Regions:
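Short, positively charged low-complexity motifs
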Residues: 6-12, 19-21
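Conserved non-catalytic scaffold segment of RNase H-like nuclease domains
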Residues: 48, 53-178, 192-213
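A short, structured active-site edge motif that brings together acidic residues
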Residues: 176-187
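Acidic donor-binding loop at a coil-to-helix junction in glycosyltransferase catalytic cores
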Residues: 217
């Protein structure tokens, strides 16, 4: 979980953060804290968040206290959220009582993994041959994600959509997180220089990323 969270917090505390970025973050704050009211418009939001400086990480921890907060990442057979399948799933974080959660598993997609996908994440047909398919982890995954705060680099437009397709394929409704925070959306809205992939962002902000393109490492 720390990688995606650290990317957000380090971006937020840089001196040249833009008003657009501040508005985006304030919206996330509002979604986590329903009784928050914006009273002074954009200027008030900007000044308030800038005044927090490096204390924003402490504030974020306070806002999320009592929530199940999970970094989420998938490795898949491809990039289609409708037809491709999960080959690895990771959910890392804390429960509402601050107990650690580390759920990481390989998944048999019941289809050949294309070589192009294997070249990216290093998972081959032989690695998943003895694993269960998604139906064997569907219930546990649902219980973890439903009602949780989910953080991932492209979680809203890719991971959650592809996960939803797996559930619909089984004839089940997918879990509904309380909120999904996609770090990719944050960096794009802040107009941070490309590249926007997680590895490049971690390098830019001095965050160690080992075993990139495994679900647990990316989460």
């Amino acid at each position: 979980m720390r990688l995606n969270v650290e990317v957000v917090l380090l971006i937020l505390t840089t001196p040249n953060i833009t008003p657009t970025g501040l508005v985006l973050v304030s919206n996330a704050v509002v979604s986590w804290c329903g009784n928050f009211r914006i009273r002074n418009g954009l200027c008030g939001i900007r000044n308030w968040l800038r005044s927090l400086g490096n204390r924003f990480d402490i504030m974020a921890q306070d806002l999320l206290r009592g929530e199940r907060v999970l970094a989420f990442d998938l490795e898949t057979t491809g990039i289609s959220t409708n037809s491709d399948r999960i080959v690895q799933l990771a959910l890392l974080g804390v429960d509402s009582n601050e107990a650690p959660i580390h759920f990481e598993t390989l998944v048999n997609p019941r289809m050949p993994i294309p070589y192009g996908a294997s070249d990216v994440h290093g998972i081959y047909d032989a690695d998943v041959r003895g694993q269960g398919d998604f139906s064997t982890i569907a219930d546990e995954t649902f219980e973890l994600i439903d009602g949780a705060v989910i953080i991932g680099h492209n979680a809203r437009n890719f991971d959650m959509k592809l996960l939803g397709s797996e559930y619909l394929r089984m004839g089940k409704l997918p879990p509904k997180p309380k909120v999904v925070l996609a770090t990719l959306e944050v960096v794009r809205r802040l107009k941070i220089a490309r590249p926007h992939n997680l590895g490049a962002l971690c390098k830019r902000y001095g965050i160690s990323l080992e075993n990139a393109h495994t679900a647990a490492a990316d989460a």
